Amino acid sequence: MLSPKKTRFRRQHRGRMKGLASRGNHISFGKYGLQALEPAWITSRQIEAGRRAMTRNARRGGKIWVRIFPDKPVTIRPAETRMGSGKGSPEFWVSVVKPGRILYEMDGVTKNVAKRAFGIAASKMPIRTQFIFSEIK
């Protein structure tokens, strides 16, 4: 599973997901992409599940790029703990995804294969997504 090797601080504020993605919203590496249509936190487990599903579906052909990285720690307090005594310990990592962000890219396969693979990966995601393709490559 993906997680940062080293961070400056162990804990982060939750923050809020306003607006559209201003970065990472264009296809850069491949020919096909999976684009987020809703804001959400996507966990490292979900990213990995989507990547595995796509790899299995595309079989030998094609290359896959994961365009998001989980760099935000989510803390959880133990069950039945009294208030106070600080913030909980980091339990898992998430990637903050805004609408328009490209989640995965793929190249080296036909459009039908890419669409089917992205469809399976999209079912692993907690948000609505759309299949997009680049006219240039």
From Swiss-Prot:
Disulfide bonds: none annotated. It comes from the Eukaryota. GO terms for cellular component: mitochondrial large ribosomal subunit; plastid. One of its GO terms (biological process) is mitochondrial translation. The gene is rpl16. GO terms for molecular function: rRNA binding; structural constituent of ribosome. It comes from Cuscuta gronovii. Belongs to the universal ribosomal protein uL16 family. HAMAP family: Ribosomal_uL16. CDD domains: Ribosomal_L16_L10e. This is Large ribosomal subunit protein uL16c. PROSITE patterns: RIBOSOMAL_L16_1 (PS00586), RIBOSOMAL_L16_2 (PS00701). The lineage of its organism: Eukaryota, Viridiplantae, Streptophyta, Embryophyta, Tracheophyta. It is found in: Plastid. Keywords: Plastid, Ribonucleoprotein, Ribosomal protein. Part of the 50S ribosomal subunit. Coiled coil: none annotated. InterPro entries: Ribosomal_uL16, Ribosomal_uL16_bact-type, Ribosomal_uL16_CS, Ribosomal_uL16_dom, Ribosomal_uL16_sf.
